[in-house]
A protein has these predicted regions:
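Short gly/ser-rich loop at a beta-strand->alpha-helix junction or flexible surface loop bordering the NTP-binding
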Residues: 1-197
Length: 197
């Protein structure tokens, strides 16, 4: 019996390792932890309940982007970290979002006051992984910031940081500007004329 418990724990830890120490109740159930066992582990301090149906291993080292994984699990892996939250995770720009920005499928209906949802179908090429969480690519992130902000200083800070970090070239961004509306495209061109003439 102790070997079974150890095998269960190892399976759960392997799963949590790819998710910044987080896991969902449904994932624990799939590994072999009944709901009663889940309650036991929370009550005895073996797991921390982060939200309804979302847990974390308490001794797991914290990382810079840990909280993003929580929201990906909350969405049942349907959300992609995006917009200001993605820019902040990449360290690009003067963004400091008060809420977590997530891009979700058009039929996504969950909601939480701590998140801002953006409904859009994202092509695979626009999605990356960062510490186990799905996040928009740098190019998609920059386009999202251009679309959602009229403050050119903020937009410029994100574009300039992405270019300076080598995460994006001006040519790559210019090729994708056709995806934006006319006002957003003009804003991006003005910024690019200043930072990448």
């Amino acid at each position: 019996m102790p070997g079974d418990r150890q095998a269960l724990r190892q399976s759960l830890y392997r799963l949590a390792a790819g998710q910044a120490g987080y896991f969902a109740a449904s994932q624990a159930l799939n590994v072999g932890y009944s709901y009663q066992a889940q309650k036991y582990h929370v009550d005895h301090g073996n797991w921390v309940r982060v939200d309804r149906g979302i847990f974390r291993i308490p001794e797991w080292p914290t990382g810079l982007h840990d909280s993003l994984m929580r929201w990906v699990l909350w969405s049942k892996h349907r959300a992609v970290v995006s917009h200001d939250s993605a820019a902040a995770a990449y360290g690009h720009g003067l963004v400091n979002p008060a809420k977590v920005h997530l891009t979700v499928p058009l039929d996504f209906r969950m909601d939480d006051p701590a998140v801002v949802l953006h409904h859009r179908v994202l092509p695979e090429a626009d999605v990356r992984q960062l510490d186990g969480a799905a996040i928009t690519s740098v190019t998609r992130t920059v386009l999202d910031v251009i679309e959602s902000h009229v403050d050119e200083e903020l937009v410029e800070s994100v574009i300039d940081d992405a270019l300076s970090a080598g995460a994006l070239t001006a040519g790559q961004l210019r090729r994708r500007l056709c995806e934006l509306g006319e006002a957003e495209r003009a804003r991006a061109e003005r910024v690019l004329a200043r930072v990448a003439p």
